[in-house]
Regions:
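Membrane-embedded, hydrophobic transmembrane alpha-helices
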Residues: 512-513
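A short, polar/charged loop-to-alpha-helix boundary motif
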Residues: 522
C-alpha cells in the first residue's frame, strides 16, 4: 500500500510545485488569475482544451460503457466529440475576437454585452454554476473509487485527498498553473492509457486473440445496438447532437475561448481534436470490452471501476499504480478548470470583490471544492447516467442564446430568458420522468423546443438598447462548407449499415475501422477549411512597397 501511495503522492506534489511556480504572477489581477493574461498559445491551448474536456468519464465512464455496451459506444464519443470541435469554429473564434476587443472575463460577459441586461447575465451564470457543480463531484467520486480499488484508501479519504491537492494548486497559480499541469496531465493520460492498453492486451494473449475470445462469449459487444441494446439509432444521433451543443457551453471550455492567444491557436486545437478523440476513446472502450470477458459479472455501478480492476490483475504493483495516475490526471485536469471558472462566475457576476479580490476569490475556490466533495459523499449509481441526465442537458439549453446572439440581430433578451426558463423546465421534467422520449435522448426534444421558443419570442418582441453591432454577418462562402460538414455528420450516423452481422477485421468489426478512418478524414477537412479561410482573408493584389526612411 505504501509503495503505491508514495507514487501517487509524488505526482500530486509535482502538480503543487507548478502552482507555486506561478503563484506570484497569478496574484496580480483578475485577467492574469482567470485567463493567464489572454495568452494561451497553440500547444498549451490544445492540451488544456483536451485535458479539460477529457474528465474522469474518459477513463472510468468510457471503459465502463465499453463493458456494458461494447464498441457501439465508441463512435458516438470518438467521432462525436471530434465533430463537436466544429463548434469551436462556430462559437469559439467569434467569442475570442470579441473578448480581445471588449474585455470579457467570464462567458456571461458576452451575454451582458450582447443583450444589455445584467439580470440575464446572472441567469446565464446561475445555470452554468448549477449544472457544473455536480460535475466537480464526479471527479471526486472517480478519484475515491480509483484510489480505493488500487491502493485500498477509503473512498472518502481518496476523494478528499485529490480534491484538496487540486484546490491547492489552483489557488496558488490560477489558470497558468492549470494550463501547465494540463500539459503534463494530458500527456500522462494519453501515454499511460496507451501503456495500460498494451499491457492488458498482451497479457490477454494479444489484440486479435483477445477480441476473438470476447466475441465468442459476448458477440453483442461487437454489434449495434450493443450488448445491452441501448444504442438505438435515435440514441446514437442524440449523443452526437448533445456533444455539439452542450460541450462548448461548459463554462471551463467557453472560458478557454476567451483565454486563447489568437485564432491560429484555436484553429490548431480544432484540427487536432478529432485525432486525439479517435485514438484515446478507442483505447478506453477497448479496455472495457476486454474487461467484460475477464470480469463478466460486474454490476453497472461496479463496471465504472473496470480500468483499475484490469490493471490490478495484469500489471505489477509499481506499474499499475503508475498507470492509474493517468486516470487521476484526467479527472484532476477537469476539476481544476471547473473550480477556477465557477469562481470567476461567482465573483465577477455576483459578489464583485473590490479589495484584495484575488485573495477572496481563492477562498471561493476552497468553498467550491468543499461543496463538490460533499456531493460526492453520496455518489449516484453510475457516472454515465448522472451526467447525461443533468449536466449536459442543462448546459445545452444555453446554446440558442449564445449562437443566436452571435449571428442573429433579431434575437433579444426576452427570447433568451424565455428559452432558458422553458428549456430548464423541460430538463427537470425529463429528469423526474414527468416527460419521456422513447428511442431518443431527451436533449433532442429539449433543444428543439428551446430553439423554437427562442425564435418565436425573438420574432414577436423587441428589446431596445441591445448591442446588435457585434453580431457577425454570415459569410456567403460558408455555405459549401455547411454542406461538407453536414455530409460528414450524416456519414457519422451510418444508419444504412446497422443491424448487420459484424465482419471482423484484425479482431474488430469493420464499422469500427470505418469510424477510425472517418475521424482522420474529419481532421483533414478541418485543416483544409481553416487554410482556405485564412487564404481568403489575405489582401488581394500586389503589396505596396514601403520606402525606407
Amino acid at each position: 500500500m505504501w509503495q503505491r501511495l508514495s507514487i501517487i503522492l509524488t505526482y500530486l506534489v509535482i502538480t503543487l510545485v507548478i502552482g507555486i511556480v506561478f503563484r506570484k504572477k497569478a496574484s496580480t489581477n483578475k485577467v492574469e488569475f482567470f485567463l493567464a493574461g489572454r495568452g494561451v498559445g497553440r500547444l498549451l491551448l490544445f492540451f488544456t482544451m483536451a485535458a479539460t474536456n477529457f474528465s474522469a468519464f474518459t477513463i472510468f465512464g468510457m471503459s465502463g460503457a465499453g463493458y456494458r455496451i461494447g464498441y457501439a459506444f465508441y463512435p458516438v464519443m470518438g467521432f462525436g466529440t471530434g465533430f463537436m470541435a466544429l463548434s469551436f469554429l462556430l462559437i469559439g473564434r467569434r467569442i475570442l475576437s470579441l473578448s480581445k476587443d471588449r474585455g470579457y472575463i467570464t462567458p456571461s460577459d458576452f451575454i451582458a454585452d450582447r443583450y444589455g441586461a445584467s439580470w440575464l447575465k446572472k441567469l446565464f451564470s446561475l445555470v452554468m454554476i448549477v449544472f457544473t457543480l455536480p460535475y466537480i463531484a464526479i471527479q471526486a467520486i472517480a478519484s475515491g473509487k480509483s484510489l480505493n480499488a488500487l491502493v485500498g484508501i477509503p473512498y472518502l479519504s481518496g476523494a478528499l485527498l485529490i480534491t484538496a491537492f487540486v484546490v491547492l494548486y489552483v489557488t496558488l497559480g490560477g489558470l497558468r498553473s492549470i494550463v501547465w499541469t494540463d500539459l503534463i496531465q494530458a500527456s500522462m493520460m494519453i501515454v499511460f492509457t496507451l501503456a495500460a492498453f498494451i499491457i492488458i492486451f498482451r497479457r490477454s494473449g494479444g489484440f486479435v486473440r483477445a477480441h476473438e475470445e470476447v466475441y465468442s462469449s459476448f458477440p453483442a459487444l461487437f454489434s449495434r445496438p450493443g450488448q445491452d441494446g441501448s444504442m438505438l439509432f435515435g440514441i446514437w444521433f442524440g449523443y452526437l447532437f448533445l456533444w455539439f451543443f452542450a460541450d462548448p457551453m461548459f463554462p471551463q471550455l467557453f472560458q478557454r475561448f476567451i483565454a486563447a492567444k489568437d485564432e491560429k491557436s484555436l484553429n490548431t486545437t480544432v484540427v487536432l481534436y478529432p485525432l486525439i478523440t479517435t485514438f484515446l476513446f478507442f483505447l478506453t472502450v477497448s479496455i472495457g470490452v476486454l474487461g467484460r470477458h475477464t470480469f463478466p459479472n460486474l454490476s453497472p455501478a461496479e463496471s465504472d471501476a473496470i480500468f483499475p480492476l484490469l490493471l490490478q490483475r495484469y500489471a505489477g504493483v509499481f506499474v499499475s499504480t503508475l498507470l492509474i495516475t493517468g486516470s487521476l490526471a484526467a479527472l484532476m485536469s477537469t476539476m481544476d478548470s471547473q473550480l477556477l471558472t465557477l469562481t470567476s462566475l461567482i465573483t465577477v457576476d455576483f459578489v464583485h470583490f473590490k479589495k484584495r479580490e484575488v485573495l477572496k476569490e481563492k477562498g471561493v475556490i476552497v468553498a467550491l471544492g468543499a461543496l463538490g466533495f460533499l456531493i460526492a459523499v453520496k455518489p449516484p449509481q453510475t457516472i454515465l447516467d448522472f451526467i447525461s441526465k443533468t449536466t449536459f442537458n442543462g448546459l445545452a439549453v444555453l446554446a440558442p442564446t449564445v449562437i443566436g446572439g452571435l449571428y442573429w440581430k433579431r434575437s433579444n433578451r426576452y427570447a433568451a430568458a424565455a428559452s432558458i426558463v422553458a428549456g430548464e423546465g423541460l430538463v427537470l421534467a425529463f429528469y423526474f420522468n414527468v416527460l419521456s422520449a422513447p428511442g431518443i435522448l431527451p436533449v433532442v426534444p429539449i433543444l428543439a423546443a428551446t430553439a423554437v421558443v427562442f425564435i418565436v419570442v425573438s420574432l414577436l418582441s423587441t428589446a431596445p438598447g441591445e448591442n446588435t453591432g457585434i453580431v457577425a454577418p454570415v459569410q456567403p462562402g460558408i455555405w459549401p462548407w455547411v454542406l461538407v460538414f453536414s455530409g460528414l455528420f450524416i456519414l457519422g450516423n451510418d444508419f444504412w449499415a446497422w443491424n448487420r452481422e459484424p465482419l471482423l477485421v484484425i479482431g474488430l468489426p469493420l464499422w469500427v475501422w470505418y469510424y477510425v478512418g472517418l475521424g482522420v478524414v474529419l481532421s483533414l477537412f478541418y485543416r483544409v477549411f481553416v487554410l482556405r479561410e485564412a487564404k481568403g482573408r489575405e489582401p488581394k493584389g500586389p503589396r505596396k512597397a514601403v520606402k525606407p526612411t
